[in-house]
């Protein structure tokens, strides 16, 4: 769900510099789509990039989103469901025909996500906050600015992006989907490992991650 900031993080992981993306994208960019991407520069986190380089990254992001509208809508549906659950403590909020459910305790100490397996992910101290300011160079700020300054839910916990320090974590839709997919992959792996062992195939090594 992150845009330019997330794209930069991914590119860095592969040793790709933003300037190289600009060089590859600019000559083949469709004019209207390029101008539309560039028009977002002033109101979005800029991550220290000049407008041309920023626009090149945003152009790629916009193109991917246009090609995958169901995924994009899924981010916002998830974010809306989380907000609805916190706004209506004591009631279930359902997604995907009830395969994923959210429930916020009446005292609002915990928000629970019920997975298809029946396992539960719990988030401490959920509360609704206003969008981050556009001058904050974070994925959360970018996600908020990217969809009409939507509200979001924050919780408390150990933040892997800050070295595991305790603090506030933004539960925007993309992160909730990441949590759900990671947890689902773990459930599939655990079930498969037990099935293999029962069939006479001992498990000697295993790993799981988001596909």
Task: Please give the residue ranges for each predicted region.
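Glycine- and acidic
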Residues: 169-179, 206-211
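Acidic/histidine-rich catalytic cores and adjacent linkers
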Residues: 154-156, 162, 180-184, 198
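Electropositive nucleic-acid-contacting surfaces
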Residues: 1-173
């Amino acid at each position: 769900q992150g845009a330019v900031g997330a794209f930069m993080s991914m590119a860095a992981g592969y040793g790709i510099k933003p300037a190289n993306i600009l060089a590859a994208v600019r000559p083949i960019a469709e004019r209207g789509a390029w101008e539309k991407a560039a028009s977002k520069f002033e109101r979005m986190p800029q991550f220290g990039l000049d407008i041309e380089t920023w626009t090149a990254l945003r152009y790629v992001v916009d193109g991917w989103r246009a090609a995958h509208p169901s995924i994009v809508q899924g981010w916002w549906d998830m974010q809306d469901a989380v907000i609805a659950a916190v706004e209506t403590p004591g009631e279930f909020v359902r997604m995907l025909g009830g395969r994923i459910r959210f429930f916020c305790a009446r005292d609002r100490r915990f928000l629970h996500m019920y997975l298809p397996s029946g396992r539960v992910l719990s988030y401490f101290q959920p509360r609704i906050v206003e969008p981050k300011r556009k001058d904050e160079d974070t994925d959360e700020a970018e996600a908020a600015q990217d969809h009409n300054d939507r509200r979001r839910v924050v919780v408390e916990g150990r933040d892997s992006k800050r070295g595991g320090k305790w603090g506030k974590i933004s539960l925007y839709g993309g992160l909730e989907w990441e949590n759900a997919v990671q947890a689902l992959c773990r459930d599939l792996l655990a079930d498969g490992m037990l099935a293999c062992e029962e069939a006479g195939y001992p498990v000697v090594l295993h790993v799981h991650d988001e596909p």
